């Protein structure tokens, strides 16, 4: 079984002020991942949100200054700090886990390296039982 891993980004699970175009593109990528998973049974495709990673992409926010509104201060603080953000090792481990779990567990799903309990038997069991879990949709809206 082939594996494809995509990277999500900020604004996919919460509003991301001043970055709406970026967020909409990443949300589209999440949905595309789910649709390809549904249409391609011999492919394990999943998407991973790495969290804040110190990379050059953040220089654009710093360059924008006050136009980036509250994001400027937040990014500047993180870039100036000793906090390295999410490590490449953690991101790689999550990607390896998603590939190893295969389509039954990871296929079409959106994982957070930082906030999800990936790598645990409990989550793997839940994902096997709930095809809607960790996917982009209105979910459980029929409760009374």
Which residue ranges define each predicted feature?
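Residues at the starts of beta-strands that form the adenosine-phosphate
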Residues: 44
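C-terminal helical subdomain
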Residues: 47, 67-144
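Catalytic loop of short-chain dehydrogenase/reductase
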Residues: 1-41, 49-55, 59-65
